[in-house]
């Protein structure tokens, strides 16, 4: 959580940065790059780490407190940070899935945005984090030398027995981008992600969803059925 989009681009162009455990430098600078941070609860970890923030004062935010302090950015604390990361991207349990107040739930209903119902969520911080990703891409884009993209990762993990992690890196074609990214809080159905992308395309904003880490998909890359369990063979026959 301590590496910013700005730092990521400097790393891609050959600078040395720290990942909290050791220094890292690429063998060769890259020609193009995109920051594909996880859209689900984007920007929230820094608030959870701050015990003075509104969401950081929640009792279940305590494991995240002071997450980015220097003494917590060591090899000894790496495993604990990994567990907290899994808590963020998981589809059940933990602070990220803690239900908010009845007012939060009502707001989520009328906004048709269920992330508002989470006690762990701050909408303005979420939009701010997304804006910083876009600003960093714009700042570091150098046509003909180093190409950047507005992008993010749609992150979803299935429940048991599959326990599959099968994500998509969503890359936007132009310097424009939607107000906020579509995350698994909106839907864990990839077909609805594609429908959202089609809607953006109709408005002139093209994008591409690239399957990410299919090795952890437990066979979901080559499913014979749609998300609603209708077989592709049946669809082709009708």
Ranges and model annotations:
Residues 1-236:
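Extended, charged catalytic domains and RNA/DNA-binding interfaces, predominantly
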């Amino acid at each position: 959580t301590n590496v910013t989009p700005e730092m990521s681009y400097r790393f891609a162009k050959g600078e040395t940065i720290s990942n909290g455990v050791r220094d890292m430098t690429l063998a060769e600078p890259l020609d193009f790059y995109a920051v594909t941070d996880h859209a689900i609860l984007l920007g929230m970890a820094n608030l959870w780490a701050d015990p003075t923030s509104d969401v950081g004062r929640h009792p279940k935010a305590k494991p995240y407190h002071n997450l980015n302090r220097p003494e917590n950015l060591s090899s000894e604390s790496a495993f604990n940070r990994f567990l907290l990361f899994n808590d963020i991207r998981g589809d059940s349990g933990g602070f990220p899935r803690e239900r908010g107040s009845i007012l939060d739930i009502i707001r989520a209903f009328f906004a048709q945005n269920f992330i508002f119902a989470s006690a762990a969520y701050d909408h303005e911080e979420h939009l701010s984090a997304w804006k910083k990703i876009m600003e960093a891409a714009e700042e570091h884009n150098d046509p003909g030398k180093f190409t950047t993209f507005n992008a993010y990762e749609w992150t979803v993990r299935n429940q048991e027995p599959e326990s599959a992690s099968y994500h998509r890196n969503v890359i936007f074609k132009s310097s424009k981008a939607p107000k906020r990214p579509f995350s698994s809080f909106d839907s864990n159905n990839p077909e609805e992600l594609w429908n959202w992308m089609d809607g953006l395309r109709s408005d002139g904003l093209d994008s591409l969803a690239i399957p990410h880490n299919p090795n952890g998909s437990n066979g979901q890359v080559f499913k014979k059925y749609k998300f609603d369990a209708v077989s592709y063979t049946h669809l082709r026959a009708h």
